[in-house]
Each structure stands twice: as structure tokens, then as C-alpha cells.
Amino acid sequence: MPVPRFTSSLLRSPRARCFSTSTSRRSYEDSVQNLKIGKHTRVLYQGFTGRVATQNAKESLEYGTNIVGGVKPGGSGEHLGLPVLPTVREAKEQLKPDATAIYVAAPHAGKAIEEAIEAEIPLIVAVAEHIPLHDILRIMSMLKTQSKSRLVGANAPGIISAIGHCRIGFQPLPTFSPGHVGIVAKSGTLSYETVASITRAGLGQSLCIGMGGDVVAGTNFVDALRVFETDPDTEAIVLVGEVGGTAELEAADWIKDYYRREKDP
């Protein structure tokens, strides 16, 4: 049986690339601990000089986030008193970031995420909505071949450590207070309401992960639960679901299994 033309063309293509940078014993699941951000986290901005990114970076810097610089394709110099570099790879080499916040418009966000994966940035937070589905599917295929980079999003409010005063995203800062409740949510708005209620109750938050409402997401409920399970700062967990998909059911199965395997959960 002849090989389909498109398959043969792909096999011959000199541009075909492999994104696996780790041994076969490791996988994308091993990157889940990259979600544990804090004061130590060095944050890079892609699309750094844009209006939205600039305002967001100013707020995050004031909050205490350790922003080390940004990327503008073909750019250089400084912005907000921080270095601007032309590529993510150069930023990785010079600034040693632990995470990148991608403030790039949806049509170009996929390429920005790919660049961050190729540079092996440990944590990638993509906030843009309406990234084309074929871009996200391609990105997920890339992520599954490696163990260095972890994606939050796309279409996500981001991730924030209230204890470590580190925000990578656009969550409303006045609602957060340091504490020991971990939160993972699909809906950004519902997560803000949950955070505000916990703050009013005097409890506070440890780590809050906004996974985004898209069906295909870089991080899901189970990933967040695995982080909270070993996080000494988290004593209670809140899951905020949304209609659509099976993520909540998968989380319920994980929790049942957790109670079976832990003698003192």
C-alpha cells in the first residue's frame, strides 16, 4: 500500500523538528512542580513593551513579583528599567528566568509559546483568549515530548503565590491575602469570588492556579492537586469547576485514589 503523499512529504521535510530534550524516562507530567512559584521565581515578559503588558508588569512589580526583563522581537534596550532582549533564547541565557508571562495577541501567541518551549522556560503562562485551536493542539504535541516546560493556559488568568507575592497573570491583587488555602479554577471570575470570600473569612491563600476554561489546557485539576499534595504551605484545597469537559470527574477520581493510598490524608 503506497504511503499517503502528505505523510511522505512530512518525513522528507528538512524542517521537521523534535522537541524532546529529556530522556524517555521523563515526561510532561514531571514538569508539574514548576507550578510552585514564589519569591524565588524570576519572571520574563514576552510582548513586554505593549500597553497591556506594561501596565500589568507595573502592578506585579509593585506587588513584589521578581520581573527580570522582557522580550520584544528585534528589540533591545530597557523598559521599566529592565532589560529588553530580541529573543526568548537570548533572554534565557542572560536573565535565567524561571517563568514567562506571554502578553502577545492571539494570532501570534502560539508562536510565542513555541519559542518559550524551545528555550526550555520552566513555566509558561498564556493569558490570551481565542488562540486558534490548531495552534494549541500543536503546542500540546510539543509539550508531550519534553519534561522541562509547563504551560498554564491558554485563555487563563494565570497563577499567583499570595505567600510569595508572585503574580504571573492578571488576577485582581487587592482580593488576595497570604494563607494556606490552595485554589485551582477553570473560571477566572469565579476564582476571584472564591479568593475574596476566603480573604473575608480571614484564611488567606497559598497558591492560586487559574487553568483557564478551554477544553484543551496545558494544566488541569489533577496537575494542580499533585502540586498541592506535596506543598507544605497548603492545608486545604478549593476546586472551582465549570460546565463542560471531564476535568472535574478526573479530579474526583484522583481524590478518591488519594484517600485510598494515604493512611492519614
Each model region followed by its residue ranges:
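Catalytic-core regions of core metabolic enzymes
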Residues: 2-265
